[in-house]
Amino acid sequence: MAIGLACLTLTACQYDIPITSAPTRKVQEPLLGDWTSADGKEKLKLRSLDGSIYIVYYDGDLFRAYHSDIAETPFVTVQDLNSNDRKYAYVIWKLSEDRKSLRLRNVNDKVVPEGIRDSAGVVALLTKNARNPELFGEEIEFKKEK
């Protein structure tokens, strides 16, 4: 999951609706486990809740996440479970071929603004901007713990 992390750059948990209302694929086993940021300051734990939903523990907070693939891009819908409003973050994540590195990036709210009223509107904007280099924020890299 690419997570501009603070709402997994999850200070990006600002959207009222998910990208997709249901997961678009199953949990990927290689993503599960404990991860540490490249600078060693942040810890990320990914667990499977069921066959399609991840539970994410990040910096003392819990999140629910699932794949929301759009326009051949591996988006992830991330929901903050600690807040009362349960808002969402939109991220991408990319697992390295050796499965030891996970890169996360959040969707830029200047390209996909808050206030979209339904998932169809979110999907339309993400599809339209899939090749836009401004779509994503900074990348955060995590290394898998042994």
Which role does the model predict for each range below?
Residues 14-31, 38-146:
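Calycin-type beta-barrel ligand-binding domains and close structural analogs
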